[in-house]
């Protein structure tokens, strides 16, 4: 939501799930260094990533940029951004003075007004993403309905408690209910 694109993490996970089920080959990126983020969110995400290792991992991980004409470029102070400067790659391509590079560049680097440096808090998360990229091809999580109505989960993720889990009764009902992404509060009526 901090990128103001109208989606939540749960929506993104549901999309990964649906596209995986449909057999779509996914190519996507993961962004970090989003203005207004809570550094502790990276710790939480690093802990959760092993649970989704069966989904296609991002092909690239990169820092959010302030591109020309973007809100981060046009209204940097509103997002706690300062010191906008042309991306360092422009210096290698165009041997021009700073003023000319500033007018020419489309991609910009920046600092955060509060002094934060995301490089100092994303390392465990980056390690978890790399582990995801390494483990993905060996990990599956699938469900099959049995003739007796039970649901059998087959799980080869490294975090799996066991290879197969048989769900029936309330466990099966909860699993099926959660097939469409749900929030914890949505589960109250099962209590």
List each model region and its residues.
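Conserved non-cysteine loop/helix-boundary elements of the Radical SAM core domain that shape
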Residues: 1-55
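C-terminal scaffold of the Radical SAM
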Residues: 22, 39-173
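Short strand-loop junctions, especially beta-strand C-caps/beta-turns
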Residues: 31-33, 156, 190
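Long, charge-rich, low-complexity alpha-helical segments
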Residues: 165-191
